[in-house]
Amino acid sequence: MGPDTTSERVSEDLMQAVTCLKRVMVGMKSNGTDYVQEQTPSNSTTVICTLVKITGALERCIESNKAMNDVLNGKMKCTTCGATSVGLLSDCHDSATSTTTTVSHRSSEEPPRRKPSAAGGDHDDEELECSSIESRSIRSVSSSVHTSAEDDETNQTMMVPTDVADVINAIVAGTNGSSNSNTTSSSKSPQEEEEEHDLVMKSILSTTTSTSNTKLELSEKLENPLQDTALLDQFLQASLLGQTPTVTPASEENEEDKEQNAVLTSFLQILFANQQAGNAILDAGSSENDGSTSSSQPSPPADPTASLDSLAMFESLLAESMNGNVLDANTSSADQKAAARKRKSTPMKVPKSENGAGYICPMDGCNKVFKEKGSVHRHFVTHIGMRFNCDKCKASYTQKHALMLHQKIHANPDAYQCRGCGTNYTTQNGLRLHRQRNPACMEVSNALEFNTSLNTSISEALSGPLSKNSSPTKQMVSAP
């Protein structure tokens, strides 16, 4: 008996036992007189009858085992409570154990004796002995099952009797005792035998259900996975053996995990490279000290800046990786924004007019026609609401070239300025149009122009006579 016991193994062993018993019965019927006389002084017919009853009992055990399997699989109903689930059959365990105890107590008592009748005494004795053997075999099986159930409660392991040899030995011992004793036992009624058989099967079912639950709990405890410490093991092995670690990331890692593992790998390689270099320097210094005994000066210590260099390099690697990620993110976002702006400002397709003389605005509801495609693009910006703002003032324009003309005002503010209101313009045409739209500014500008022209003419008139009068005086002075 062991933890690997199953109902299938029990049924196989019982079938083998039945086959062996049938062979023994056939052999004893053919030439069983001498064999029985050598082994036991009992009658051969009694032994054959006993074996027949034993075989029948074993066959009934096999059938009950099959019935138990059907009940466990949910194919049959319990004879007591009518349940088809294994968990519900465990409720019958208490009643089964108590009744099994009474059955075992009855089997320990001596059966009542009957006096053999004069006529047909041998035949009656054989029947009585066979019935007593059958009842004792069933009681022995029930007692063995009862003990196994008690062991199962204490040890929490399934203890179903798979070694059929033990059961057969117990039955044969009972038959030997009955053959040696010339007493006969009273046979029980079939109803009592069926009740005993049902109790035995209930106890077996209760033990199997309890052990199956314990097996499930143990399997759940054993199936708890351990944490993955492959990277830590590799690091420890490399640090102890002085080897360069090789980090092998999992196949299903994310991109961030892969980048972190790459940085960690580079750091470990740099660290162990510096460590190996320091070890090589120390080994070289020790060999030089061993070879030259005349030099009493100790070897110089290892360079303490090696570890600092490795840490600085590691920090630079981390900074580069972080800056690279940030720059990549910024450039990608800027490129995406520029592309989106370009897509918004430029129509996908500029259709031509019906006669093919120009280009039509693709915006719904706008039927303007332009001669050039660039004009359509500049006009399309007005529909999407995009504006170009001046960085020096609050002016904003729908077209870029208008902003460029506006920025000339900030470069030369007095180039084209209205004298009436002080407004600056980038072109002379703009100033002229402003004067035409504003008559007051036109009058002020005309008056100012008249005054300036008058002043210039007066200055010229005054400067002319003075120059003419000065020349003769000079001549007069210069004359002899």
UniProtKB/Swiss-Prot annotation:
Region Disordered: what ranges?
92-160, 174-198, 282-307, 328-351, 461-480
Specify residue ranges for compositional bias: Low complexity: 95-105, 131-145, 174-187, 286-296
Q: Which InterPro entries match?
A: Znf_C2H2_sf (IPR036236), Znf_C2H2_type (IPR013087)
Impact of altering C441Y?
In ot280; expression of the dopamine transporter dat-1 abolished in the PDE mechanosensory neurons forming the posterior deirid ('postdeirid') sensillum. Ectopic formation of CEPV mechanosensory neurons
GO function term, MF aspect, one = zinc ion binding
Keywords attached to this entry: Metal-binding, Repeat, Transcription, Transcription regulation, Zinc, Zinc-finger
**What Gene Ontology terms for biological process does this UniProt record contain?**
asymmetric stem cell division; epidermal cell fate specification; neuron fate specification; positive regulation of gene expression; regulation of transcription by RNA polymerase II
C2H2-type ZnF: 359-383, 388-410, 416-441
Query: What SMART domains has UniProt attached to this entry?
Result: ZnF_C2H2
Annotated Gene Ontology cellular components are: chromosome
Instruction: Say which domain of life the source belongs to.
Output: Eukaryota
Describe the function of this protein.
Answer: Probable transcription factor, involved in regulation of dopamine neuron lineage specification. May play a role in maintaining robustness of the Wnt/beta-catenin asymmetry pathway.
Domain remarks: Third 'degenerate' zinc-finger domain essential for function.
**Protein name stated in the entry:** Zinc finger protein ztf-6
